Amino acid sequence: TYGSAYEPAPVTPVADNFFYSAAGGNQSLVTRIWEMIGYLVAPDIMAKKFFLLQGPSNTGKSVLGRFIQNIFPKGQVTGLSLSQLGDANLPAEFMGSRLNLSMDLSNNKTDPKAIERIKLLTGNDLISQNIKYKDNRSYNGQCKFLFSTNHPIRLKQWDDAFFQRIVCIPFYNVISQEHKDTKLLDKLLSEKDGIVSKALFYYQELKKRNYLFEGQDK
């Protein structure tokens, strides 16, 4: 337990302030951000979820995305869009990826093929083994997915199961140019070890709740 003499809570004032500001002071949403980071880092795909940072420009989405990207080794991060994930075969660079990060989803309606693919890729079931790379090797099912958009999600065909896979992190607190901290990413990276440690604590609590993210319906 954090706060004991044996395991003090990591000190992460920059992250704490950033998450609080990005969430507009909504503590439930702050908790969800911590849970998201913890789950993305943990070697666990049981939640069957992917993550969406959603809201206007200049709200901190890209800074958070770049910070999360920097947690992982470069060779374990890919940048395939939803439409690219819907292609017949996964590209070779996806092999070994632990995080797929696409930070600028368009306002176009998403094709049903891409919807089905992301459901399979986050499904943690045997059917994902039918997803192939171009050299016919099977997908190993270890990648997590983080997307960001300034727009509402639009589908060519409604799909309840797709929306049930999304853990949305809304960003609505627009920061003006004069108040923007251009060194924020560097400051967050200086706290990286503490942020990851704290996020993994939230992840352990998430597991105890059977992967019910803060603020989600049961």
Range-by-range predicted roles:
Residues 1-59, 63-218:
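Feature primarily recognizes SF3-like P-loop helicase cores of small DNA viruses
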